[in-house]
Amino acid sequence: MLDIKALRADPEAIAAQLKKKGYELDVATFSSLEERRKAIQVETEQLQQARNSVSKEIGQAMKSGDKDKAAELKAQTATLGDDLEAAKTQLTQVQEELESLLEGIPNLPHASVPEGKTEDDNVEIRRWGTPKQFDFEPKDHVDLGEAMEMLDFEAAVKITGSRFAVMHSDLARLHRALTQFMINTHADLHGYTEVYVPYLVNAHSLKGTGQLPKFEADLFKVPVDKDSGNNDLYLIPTAEVPVTNLVRDEILNDADLHKKFVAHTPCFRSEAGSYGRDTRGMIRQHQFEKVELVHVCRPDISEQVLEELVGHAEVILQKLELPYRTVILCGGDLGFSAHKTYDIEVWLPGQGKYREISSCSNMWDFQARRMQARWRNPETGRPELAHTLNGSGLAVGRTLVAVLENYQNADGSVRVPDVLVPYMGGKTVLKKA
């Protein structure tokens, strides 16, 4: 959520910044609501003062024994009380309208975010590795997995529906190996604290990280028995939600920052609006797994922390020897809650192009304001909003796709990357039994 004080001070300047994201701020509506809020707030304060003043007069009239005046003043108090309650109701309504408007406004883009409307306008920052030149026509992961009888989409359709997968034997083990390798690297090499979190979260948590109310259509909602006293829950679209909410409503000591969390979870997305896109294979699924990295830090270091975060995700690809490129997202492709984002795209021979495998974002104080995640500044002694960042380190399914396609052999077998061999019990090749 944006700082409403900044929005009140100069809504036109905020609107100009938001245009980089392709968002048109309704300044007229905001200004109208603000004027109403201020007028009703002044009226409320005046009514409160008037009632307090009359209440004092009642006390004086009672002391002097003037019962008639006291009765008259009590009638005035009752009228003022009714007017005050009506004004408070109006003020609450206007504040709720303002809150609803604010919840729909995206985060401001960083000054370094390039102009642009779509992913075609993203700017490449660097590349690592060279795509392998095969002396045969490389297959995609679907053909490879099905030929080895380790990847079964038909079974998934039978069990659940489209955009799900069933993995067997060594492919399932390779998927697990990737997960363990990623977590171990981030925990042991990069100093992250591993956390295990719920896969179901409440609406408050999703609101805190920015998925609600705007993106409810992308979520899987799980109705809960109202008699239990619980509200409906949602399957997590990313571990970013439960992990970042660990600091919701907290005031962290400076000595406790910055925090670095790593979590492995399944993720669930309805992929609303993705009809017809990536219908083949494991690129875009309703259920997939990710190793998520979350940082909570002081505001003065969040820009350098973003660079660190991207570097940690890149290390995984380097250790797997998978070619990739890193791009900075343009304003039009930037996420709702993001201030600045780098995407890491891995080379997929089966598609002949780079595809996103990690998205690393600095959310600035946008999520922290929604969650009231704060730290105590030792210089002032006062609580201030922290900065939050997150990124995939990496998307496990897409990494598996990249390994299959980049490490394939002419006979349809797949070599296991050297760094994963210990996780595979020494197995070096995946092939049909």
UniProtKB/Swiss-Prot annotation:
Pathway: Aminoacyl-tRNA biosynthesis; selenocysteinyl-tRNA(Sec) biosynthesis; L-seryl-tRNA(Sec) from L-serine and tRNA(Sec): step 1/1. It comes from the Bacteria. One of its GO terms (cellular component) is cytoplasm. Coiled coil: none annotated. One of its GO terms (biological process) is selenocysteine biosynthetic process. InterPro entries: aa-tRNA-synt_IIb, aa-tRNA-synth_II, aa-tRNA-synth_II/BPL/LPL, Ser-tRNA-ligase_type_1, Ser-tRNA-synth_1_N, SerRS_1_N_sf, SerRS_core, tRNA-bd_arm. It is an enzyme of class 6 (ligase). HAMAP family: Ser_tRNA_synth_type1. Belongs to the class-II aminoacyl-tRNA synthetase family. Type-1 seryl-tRNA synthetase subfamily. This is Serine--tRNA ligase. The gene is serS.
